[in-house]
Swiss-Prot record:
Protein encoded by which gene: rsmJ
Top-rank EC class of the record's enzyme: transferase
EC number(s) recorded for this UniProt protein: 2.1.1.242
Binding locations of S-adenosyl-L-methionine: R101, D102, E117, R118, S153, S154, D171
Any single Gene Ontology cellular-component annotation: cytoplasm
HAMAP family for the chain: 16SrRNA_methyltr_J
Naturally occurring in which organism (per UniProt): Shigella dysenteriae serotype 1 (strain Sd197)
GO MF, any single term: rRNA (guanine-N2-)-methyltransferase activity
Protein name as it appears in the record: Ribosomal RNA small subunit methyltransferase J
Length: 250
């Protein structure tokens, strides 16, 4: 995959070329999307819209830390949707990991989550965020146990993941109407990089075959059900709904 690669660390230790080799990235000086290694983290920038700033994965501080400490925990919609109850903490495959927010919420309340991400740039961002999270004194211990990254396409990986999870979680890219600055910033940068998930409808059936209990699909409230397969079961929030489908018992 071609992208502009920029090293702002000033160390000259070749870390960026090692990273490029690992994720199969090729430097393209003219690419509008840039993957930038800063002294603090790896980030994605849209070079023709510098005001958007960089997008990076941070499990330790910022919004994720606030959500972990002060969010709803088990009461969050995604936790309810995957079926967390009492001692039951399902094993989850998040087949559309993105920046890992929902996966992190589930891991923080006790679920073991395997994140799938097919885009190598997004996978590199996730891997960088995980490395910093694993090294953190406060959350590193449980994060290593509960949150892992698999760089693979969900369309193929969903057929051969072992052991089978109890829940498969899907949150395919869908054009957002919301006007919040954060959504606009991230969606604009993200959609410039990966585009819409045009093959997302093909995920539902393999997900249902893989999950032993249920499949949860996050949709904006105005979006049709995935693959146009309606379900009466959903957890509904202000702007989204989490459609719930039966899996395939072991």
């Amino acid at each position: 995959m071609q992208i502009c690669l920029i090293d702002e660390t000033g160390t000259g230790d070749g870390a960026l070329s090692v990273l490029a080799t690992r994720w199969g990235l090729e430097h393209d000086e003219d690419n509008l999307m840039a993957l930038v290694l800063t002294p603090e983290h790896l980030e994605l920038r849209k070079r023709d819209e510098p005001k958007l700033g960089g997008i990076f994965v941070d499990f330790v501080g910022g919004a994720m830390a606030h959500r972990r400490k002060f969010g709803g925990g088990r009461g969050e919609a995604v936790a309810k949707a995957v079926g967390i109850k009492g001692d039951y903490l399902p094993d989850v495959v998040d087949a559309t990991a993105g920046l890992g927010r929902d996966a992190f919420v589930l891991a923080s309340v006790g679920c073991r989550v395997r994140m799938l991400e097919r885009n190598p740039v997004v996978a590199a961002l996730l891997d960088d965020g995980l490395a910093r999270g694993y090294a953190d004194a406060e959350i590193g211990g449980w994060l290593q146990e509960r949150l892992q990254l698999i760089h693979a396409s969900s369309l193929t990986a969903l057929t051969d993941i072992t052991p089978r999870p109890q829940v498969v979680y899907l949150d395919p890219m869908f054009p957002h109407k919301q006007k919040s600055a954060l959504v606009k910033k991230e969606m604009r940068v993200f959609q410039s990089l990966v585009g819409p998930d045009l093959d997302a409808d093909g995920l539902l059936e393999p997900a249902r075959l893989l999950a032993s209990k249920r499949v949860v699909v996050k949709r904006p409230d105005y979006a049709p059900p995935l693959a146009n397969v309606a379900t009466p079961n959903a957890v509904v929030t202000k702007g989204h709904r989490f459609d719930i489908y039966a899996g395939t018992p072991v």
